[in-house]
Amino acid sequence: MKAQDLREKSVEELNSELLNLLREQFNLRMQAATGQLQQTHTLKAVRRDIARVKTVLTEKAGA
């Protein structure tokens, strides 16, 4: 997910995207805790996507 794509979305779409990413992060953390997660790099990718969405939301709030 690119920041430029996120900047084109509305605040409501960004909030729903953030909610989906947080749910996905929770599920991945549970899989990691139980030893079921095979691709551990997805945790890092989701965490960075969450940061991107939050950054764009902050930019939109300030503008």
From Swiss-Prot:
The keyword Ribonucleoprotein applies. One of its GO terms (molecular function) is structural constituent of ribosome. PROSITE patterns: RIBOSOMAL_L29. This is Large ribosomal subunit protein uL29. PANTHER family: 60S RIBOSOMAL PROTEIN L35/50S RIBOSOMAL PROTEIN L29, LARGE RIBOSOMAL SUBUNIT PROTEIN UL29C. GO terms for cellular component: cytosolic large ribosomal subunit. One of its GO terms (biological process) is translation. It comes from the Bacteria. CDD domains: Ribosomal_L29_HIP. InterPro entries: Ribosomal_protein_uL29, Ribosomal_uL29, Ribosomal_uL29_CS, Ribosomal_uL29_sf. Transmembrane segments: none annotated. Belongs to the universal ribosomal protein uL29 family. Pfam families: Ribosomal_L29. HAMAP family: Ribosomal_uL29. Keywords: Ribonucleoprotein, Ribosomal protein. Disulfide bonds: none annotated. It comes from Vibrio vulnificus (strain YJ016).
